[in-house]
Amino acid sequence: LDFDGDAVMAGTPKGVDDENFFYQACNDKSMGWEEHHAPTAANPTINPAALARIIDGRPPLVVQQEYNAEFVDWRGQNFFKLDWLLENGAPVDYPFSCDTVYGVVDCAQKGKLQNDGSACIWFALDNLPSPHLVILDWDIIQIDGYFLKDVVPQWEGKAKHLSEICRARMGPTGLFIEDKATGITLLQQGANEGWNVHPVNSELTSLPKESRAINISGYVASGKVRISKYAFDKIVEYKQSKKNHLLTQVLQFIIGEENQDDDLFDCFNYGVALGLGNGEGF
């Protein structure tokens, strides 16, 4: 700018945020920025029919932000809907057969009531006739991270047991664990002890929760993720509250709201991304 030059700033809108400089530049004309609005449909190299297939089934607000390049006010919006997880308005039976069963683990460091818990969700993946998931079971506990070394083998055993029930053609894939904090220790111990455990891609775990939710929204909204009757009806006491914590955390997640219980929510996001994404969760 000292040489009378120009500056270009480009990005995808991310919510309505008066403190965000990109939002200010696009909406406060007194700042002097000239706006170039480029929704995906304006790209001449993209086939309109292909774009229609891409956005089909995605939540309207996701389409508005990610594809129409508009600023969306997410405040107060429950992101996931119960109907998306049901088939004809009801949870589903365990699959008669599937390709594999795997679990996804979110680890806590401390076991006090005010701290996060440790959680696991087990999924069945079937690629026929097209890739889809069934949530088989879930668990959430309040325990110090040190003692997870005794719990993880039990959760791995459950993945094996569920793979037998669901006649998994490729057997169990094991457990996917966040590669950070307590998870690093568990992955190292698992390698030494021969556990069937794998790290969740660090690029995926480093994304904000909102970005991870948007990342899987198309799969969930289009009916590629179903919840089993067992997981739907399950009630567990956790933090002095007895209820279905999986449904509560997933369905009551609100973008932009702080201090939400998210142990099972994280497992849900990672599990869907790993099962239906590109292998690295995207």
What are these model-derived regions, one by one?
Residues 10, 36-39, 67, 141-143, ...:
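Hydrophobic residues at beta-strand termini and immediately following loops
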Residues 43-108:
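ATPase catalytic-site recognition across NTP-hydrolyzing enzymes
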Residues 1-59:
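ASCE P-loop NTPase helicase motor core
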Residues 10-12, 105, 177-180:
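Short His-Asn-centered micro-motif
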Residues 96-126, 267:
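Gly/Thr-rich phosphate-binding beta-strand-loop-beta motif of the actin/hexokinase/Hsp70
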Residues 19-21, 114-115, 184-191:
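A short acidic (Asp/Glu
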Residues 87, 268-282:
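Acidic two-metal-ion nuclease catalytic site recognized across multiple nuclease folds
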Residues 74, 78, 126-253:
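Mg2+-dependent endonuclease catalytic cores in nucleic-acid-processing enzymes, primarily RNase H-like
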